[in-house]
Amino acid sequence: MDFLNDHINVFGLIAALVILVLTIYESSSLIKEMRDSKSQGELVENGHLIDGIGEFANNVPVGWIASFMCTIVWAFWYFFFGYPLNSFSQIGQYNEEVKAHNQKFEAKWKHLGQKELVDMGQGIFLVHCSQCHGITAEGLHGSAQNLVRWGKEEGIMDTIKHGSKGMDYLAGEMPAMELDEKDAKAIASYVMAELSSVKKTKNPQLIDKGKELFESMGCTGCHGNDGKGLQENQVFAADLTAYGTENFLRNILTHGKKGNIGHMPSFKYKNFSDLQVKALLNLSNR
């Protein structure tokens, strides 16, 4: 009986019962009248008369007029003061319900370990992401982004090699950079170890060289020396300090991406909780 906890459901149930009772009463009254009453009244002059059945010159029933006027008043209240044009919306109600559910969800699963987070992320990925990225997250032979590299140094190297677009930054599209694999790896190591909040790299010996290349190849022109991508307090380019973090992943899930391969739609309507985003990130970083 959980549906009775919603006042709209209760109102609808009461209204349905009232309508049912009135329908039964009115139907029984009409049936009785049809059985016992006799036709009487003055026929309309020049009115319809077919097989002896004519049209009486009776006034419109008061009850019908009252019902009609009440319907007009109710419709005016409903549209302008009650729901649609005032405050209520189905999308808003849905978002509130999802928000409440997410709070219960996070409270229930807030103490998950690493393995459980990966398992949760795997379930979310298979339902929402695998159709394009494949069940192995490798991108279905190039038809979508390879997420096995995402959030890691390999992902940065891939961006350096192919460029990036579709995030609608003021800087515009990032062009591909003509660097060999060793130099790209050095920049990726520097970004992961010094700029990103991840603060670790598989190639610490390349950090210094990566910093030199980051500055000399013009990366600071868009991303800034600190990698935050801000110019005059405006978001000019991608924030590299968030790369490989929950904020970076949520930004893509929220806005989608029109990349070199195809168009990833926004998943904002899914209202993923912070825990679900964390689970997806743990799956990606495993």
From Swiss-Prot:
Cell inner membrane among keywords: yes
GO biological process, one term: oxidative phosphorylation
InterPro entries per the UniProt record, alphabetical: CcoP_N, CcoP_N_sf, Cyt_c-like_dom, Cyt_c-like_dom_sf, Cyt_c_oxidase_cbb3_su3, Cytochrome_c_Oxidase_Subunit
Pathway in which this enzyme or protein is active: Energy metabolism; oxidative phosphorylation
GO cellular component: plasma membrane
Co-factor remark: Binds 2 heme C groups per subunit.
Cofactor names: heme c
Domain of life according to the entry: Bacteria
Keywords: Cell inner membrane, Cell membrane, Electron transport, Heme, Hydrogen ion transport, Ion transport, Iron, Membrane, Metal-binding, Oxidoreductase, Repeat, Respiratory chain, Transmembrane, Transmembrane helix, Transport
Pfam families per UniProt: Cytochrome_CBB3, FixP_N
Principal place of residence: membrane
SUPFAM superfamilies: Cytochrome c
Transmembrane annotation, as ranges: 11-31, 62-82
Membrane topology: Multi-pass membrane protein
Domain Cytochrome c: residue ranges: 116-195, 205-286
Subcellular location: Cell inner membrane
Binding site for heme c 2: 174, 219, 222-223
Disulphide-bonded residues: none
GO MF term list: cytochrome-c oxidase activity; heme binding; metal ion binding
Family: Belongs to the CcoP / FixP family.
Subunit-level organization: Component of the cbb3-type cytochrome c oxidase at least composed of CcoN, CcoO, CcoQ and CcoP.
Name of the protein in question: Cbb3-type cytochrome c oxidase subunit CcoP
